[in-house]
Amino acid sequence: MQVSEILNSGLKREIKITVPAEDMEARLMARLEDAKNKVRLKGFRPGKVPLQHLRRMYGKSFMAEVVNEILNDSSRTIISDRGEKPAMQPEISMTEDEKEAEKVLAGAADFEFSLSYEVIPPIEIKDLAGIKITRPVYDVPDEEVDEQVKRVADSVRTYEAKKGKAEKGDKVTLDYVGKLDGEPFDGGSANDSEVVIGHGQFIPGFEDELIGLKAGDTKTFKITFPETYGAQHLAGKEAEFDVTVKEVAAAEELVIDDELAKKLGLESAEKLREIIRSQLENQYGQMTRQKAKRQLLDALDESYKFEAPSKLVEAEFNNIWSQVTRDLESAGRTFEDEETTEDDARQEYQRLAERRVRLGLVLAQIGEEASIQVSDDEMQRALIETIRRYPAQQQQEIYDFYRQNPQALASVRAPLFEEKVVDQLLSQVDVTDQKVSRDELLAEDEAEGEEKKAAGETKKKAAPKKKAAKKESAAE
């Protein structure tokens, strides 16, 4: 087998491989000899089939197997022997001339093919000294825990129907029809809808219009949808609503005690508070870690400047762009609504793709040198968490897909590996904790906003069709 380099420019490589006809013939004869003792042909005793007869029958198919074997096995070996790591699967090129291909399959010509690929550049890991990170830490006050406990407890609050007028805190059962320019609009109507006045379930102003109404009352009023409303065809528009109140119910006194906790499946009110505090601390702790991670990645981005493989960058950009445009389309928004242009957005996300690829390669190299591993148990837990996002009837099928598809499984492993590398780096750099307020912790800088959009965490999404009158949830 002869290997010659055709292209060596930057990270791009192209090599030509020639397997002499006599080598191909030897590989074919080895397969025929192996088949000789296995095939059963009428008129021949086992193991007595002449090789030439076998060749006439199976020669081309066996030679095709030899070609595939060389392409699959030799390609990896050749690149590895060159001391290179391909960024992606090499592109294989070989003759498209049918006559030439027939000669190869007949063992009458050399088998020639070429591999085109980009290499992962060598990365020399630098000293972490000098990287300083300020980690924002928010101490959850008792008042916030109390407020959240009340919200959770409110989910099991009972209401008693009353004859009087609706007040703030009352639950109103109603039918409504929303109209634009006198015509009902899609998703703007509902029957037997329940709303607790003051809870902010509906768009601003809607719940206030219900105050003072009694069961049996009807009312028509106008409300303007917020400019930032998720459904673009409703954003900023004035709509008219016809409302019929079916029932007004007053909230019974809410006492947060052990009995209420038991309704929630807990043994005591103290346990409820303990769980709520733990959830809040975990939630804010994740935000703290993400901001520390962001600073770490920014520092690494400044330290490591090298050419990233263009194919990896292209693939990353395509993933980002697909997510961004899909989210915009589902929200009924445009780049103008995001105060940018498509060209500017492309440039921004191209830079983000390059950054992600570079940092991914750096973290991979650091993890490799530190012998960081993702255990089977960690993979299993992550896989189970992944398939739980799918409907129950699909979960076994999804599980089997991941277990049988190495590339899909690698997509589960990659974020686990990255987080373990980040954890190790955070334990090695200079980290200073800084007490901050809740608002300061929740504040999002521009770079974080772009990352979230690229990850599909857009702030503005389309409202569910049957709830167009309702306000977007906090997550949206």
UniProtKB/Swiss-Prot annotation:
UniProt name for this protein: Trigger factor
Catalytic activity: [protein]-peptidylproline (omega=180) = [protein]-peptidylproline (omega=0)
A GO molecular-function descriptor: protein folding chaperone
NCBIfam families: tig
HAMAP family cross-referenced by the UniProt entry: Trigger_factor_Tig (MF_00303)
Basic and acidic residues composition-biased segments: 450-460
Keyword annotations: Cell cycle, Cell division, Chaperone, Cytoplasm, Isomerase, Rotamase
Subcellular location: Cytoplasm
Single GO biological process annotation from the record: 'de novo' cotranslational protein folding
